Amino acid sequence: MRPVWAEVNLENIRHNFREVKRLARQAEAMPVIKANAYGHGAVEVAKALIAEGAKRFAVAILDEGIKLREAGIDAPVLILGYTPPEEVEKLLFYNLTPTLHHRELALAYQERLERLKKTLFYHLKIDTGMGRIGFWYEELEKIEEVLKLKNLEAEGVYTHFARADEQDLSFSKLQIERFNIVLKHLKAKGIEVKYRHAANSAAIMRLPEAHYDLVRPGIMLYGEYPSRDVPRELAHLKPALTLKARVSQVKKVPAGFTVSYGSTYVTSKATLIVSLPLGYADGYFRRLSNRGVVLINGKRWSIAGRVCMDQLMVAVDETERVNPGDEAVLLGKQGEETITAMEMADLVGTINYEILTNISYRVPRIYV
């Protein structure tokens, strides 16, 4: 096995799902396992969550749904993103549920389904303030028209929050009001759908009025909080992924020794330069050059020089005992020290979501 790997603790994911269900109460939880389950491995995570009681899943794209089916997972799967109408046959074959988010798309689906003499279940997306895909909440006539199309059966209607992870929840509450306008209109017209849903991880924790029939846990399943503005006491989450590598070489070098491309790191004293066999092609951000930290022997050590495509170097005190083959942790816990995805995100100038989903296919996932 490659001396770089990500350990995924499935029991921690199951624990986090239990926290979701505790918060959701009567609403059903639909785990979001898009982007390879946020880098954790969609198939393995889905199987673990099914064992914990999950009955349906959400993904972003058609291929993610197909991968689940090919792995033998037959639970309902909602595709949250855009699926072109020419993929209708695949949706039918794999029994996947698309999202319809504008009138022209729905009509194109209806035309193909009519020709095939088939009916397809779908969920209707409402834009209440995200400004992304979806019928604008005021387009009530178009929404009603689509919901009455033949060969298409609306199983659900949903929206997505733009700012539920911020300290100020006023915009999220406005989005709830807008979504309720649509729901009340449909009820007045005698149009019923089985599932109404809106809540992402932040809303699951902070906006119980947004739980409706389904909630869509994403980042919290993997032990991460949506932002620093979401109070930690709302849910006890356990991070599920640890990124590890084995030391490839140790060099004892004098003061004035330069390291990596551009010689941007120069030792100020005698130092151990420890090489690790992973780099930005594995999803370890180049922006962590001379900024990131690595755990070796349960202590924090700084990245020395620029992160390379396939390797990086760490500056360790010359008195430390480090040997080739020793284990280093780049994300997660070693001893009493922890490097969090949020900490890494702050250094890079991004969010913890990107830290996790950026871990590339080259890194084997090991399930513990």
Curated annotation (Swiss-Prot):
Protein name (database record): Alanine racemase
UniProt modified residues of type N6-(pyridoxal phosphate)lysine: 34
Record HAMAP family: Ala_racemase
Keywords: Isomerase, Pyridoxal phosphate
Reaction it catalyzes: L-alanine = D-alanine
CDD domains in alphabetical order: PLPDE_III_AR
UniProt binding sites for substrate: 132, 309
Family named by the database record: Belongs to the alanine racemase family.
Any one Gene Ontology cellular component term annotated for this protein: cytosol
Pathway: Amino-acid biosynthesis; D-alanine biosynthesis; D-alanine from L-alanine: step 1/1
EC identifiers of the protein: 5.1.1.1
